[in-house]
Each structure stands twice: as structure tokens, then as C-alpha cells.
Amino acid sequence: MTTWGLLFLLWPATTDTQACPRPCTCQSLETMGLKVNCEGQGLTALPVIPAHTRQLLLANNSLRSVPPGAFDHLPQLWDLDVTHNPWHCDCSLTYLRLWLEDHMPEALMHVYCASPDLATRRPLGQLTGYELGSCGWKLPPSWAYPGVWWDVSLVAVAVLGLILLAGLLNTFTESRN
């Protein structure tokens, strides 16, 4: 019976390490999670990361961006190392910046940009929204909204109504006198 009990306890660890992305190595942690080590593998894109990952080591690769939502399926992730990658710090890195701000704010000062020129050799945490770029997002001028014209029309009608009401009151009071 003890053999079956041990097998039952080790089953999650073996299934987690079988889902390990190539060329990374995976190790089960005592905290029922997974350590995924992809350091120095020359990765240019994120591999598919197992859902039970608690530690993810992506340092010393060739990663330039992180797709939006890349870590959203990893609720147990508490240690992420993305240092020493040639990050292209434009709006495509906004997701990584926001994720790090929420989960590991101290790491923002250790993630350095390789490009564009405006951001080269600067920590991701020091960049402003302007420096990250807009990705083509542009707010239309405030007069472009149809709601603004509706508001202006309502104000004009209200003012005209008040003028008419004042005129009627004035006429009514003059006729009584």
C-alpha cells in the first residue's frame, strides 16, 4: 500500500515535468509547483509554459518582446527572471512592464532595453508611457465624439428655452400692469 501511496504523491510531479517545453528543463518544487529553467537557450519567443509553473527563468536569451497575456494562465508564478535579453522597449513590451509592476516591481529596474535608441541601456521601470510608444493608439480630438455635439445641442436648446421663458414671464408681467 505504501508503494501506491508514494506513486500517487509523485504522479503530479512526473506529469508536470513531462509537459516541460523544449529546450528548457523542469524541476518539481516542494511547494507543488514547477521550476522551468530556459536560461541561455537562445530563445527568440516564449515557449508554451505549463500552468503550474511557479518559477520561470528566461534570462540570457534573445527575447525582444512578450505577447499580451503570456503569463495570464500562470496564477502560481511568483519568480520570473527575464534579465539579459535584448528587449525592444516599445509598446509591445507594455504587457511585461505591467505584469512586473503588479507581481515583481523590484525586477523592473533589472530589465534593460536594447532598443530603440531612446530607451537603449535604460531599465524598463524608468521608461515613461511616451518613451514606450503608442503602438498606433491615438485618441481622437474631443470634438470628434458625437456625444460632444449632442451635449452642445442640449445646452443650446436649454439656453433658448430659458430665453423664451424669460420673455414670456416679462410679457406676462407687463400685461398685468
Swiss-Prot record:
Residue ranges occupied by any LRRNT domain in the UniProt entry: 17-51
Protein name (Swiss-Prot/TrEMBL): Platelet glycoprotein IX
One GO-annotated biological process of the protein: positive regulation of platelet activation
Keyword Transmembrane helix: yes
Subcellular location: Membrane
Sequence ranges on the Cytoplasmic membrane side: 169-177
GO cellular component: glycoprotein Ib-IX-V complex
Positions of glycan attachment: 60
Ranges of the LRR repeats in the UniProt entry: 60-83
Residue numbers on the Extracellular membrane side: 17-147
Keywords: Blood coagulation, Cell adhesion, Disulfide bond, Glycoprotein, Hemostasis, Leucine-rich repeat, Membrane, Signal, Transmembrane, Transmembrane helix
Domain LRRCT: 85-137
